[in-house]
A protein has these predicted regions:
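Glycine/small-residue-rich phosphate/adenosyl-binding loop
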Residues: 48-122, 151
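Short hydrophobic alpha-helices that are characteristic scaffold elements of the AMP-binding
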Residues: 129-132
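C-terminal helix-cap and adjacent tail motif
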Residues: 4, 8, 18, 22, ...
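Active-site helix/loop module of the DD-peptidase/beta-lactamase fold
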Residues: 141-158
């Protein structure tokens, strides 16, 4: 089944959905996704991991510098280490630690600004949306000790962690948190000039 899932930057991407649902709009697709915090122990198949990594290749970055680096964490011993740096590991069967190389990111010519957070977050968005297409759950975690996660995962100094993504099959009965349904009114975040 072909499902249109994204209109990021006014470009529509068409994906072949693994589910039986058809979403006629990106809005409906986005409304159906929620942060999953309870996971089945079932491992994620390599072909699905590869599909998640392929959408990172498509993520736009400033000047196409492509500073992203994804650390795929599947070994049990490494997953246990994550519990020492965050209380939000959620016992997922795998994690993506999304980082950006501070030596490769775009730097503003006159201001002290780097594209680390934006470039990394666009990759995060691509991953969590593709995970939903593949029937996987995910949640974006930034509540971790930055230097400690670099130490336990053994990533180089030039890599800046942007987000930790617990990923896996949602446990039966997984449902959105109450906060998921709290949305600001459009008039509260838009101002026409």
């Amino acid at each position: 089944m072909i499902t249109i899932i994204s209109c990021l930057a006014n470009i529509y991407f068409v994906y072949r959905s693994c589910s039986t649902k058809h979403f006629p709009s990106f809005k409906e697709f986005a409304e159906s996704r929620f942060s999953v915090r309870t996971f089945s122990p079932k491992p994620v198949e390599q072909e699905k991991i590869d599909a998640l990594l392929r959408v990172v290749q498509m993520a736009p970055t400033a000047e196409n510098k492509q500073p992203q680096k994804i650390y795929v964490i599947t070994k049990e011993e490494d997953r246990k280490k994550l519990k020492t740096v965050t209380k939000y590991a959620f016992n997922a069967p795998m994690y993506f630690l999304v980082c950006c190389d501070k030596n490769k990111v775009w730097k503003h010519q006159t201001e002290d600004y780097y594209s680390i957070e934006i470039d990394g977050t666009i990759s995060v968005t691509h991953i969590i949306l593709e995970a939903h297409v593949l029937g996987l759950g995910s949640v974006v975690v930034r509540s971790f000790q930055t230097e400690k996660i670099k130490e336990v995962i053994k990533i180089p100094e030039n890599m800046v962690p942007v987000a930790l993504l617990p990923i896996g099959y949602p446990k039966e009965g997984s449902k959105p948190s109450k906060l998921h349904f709290k949305k600001n009114d459009i008039k509260d975040f838009v101002e026409y000039l």
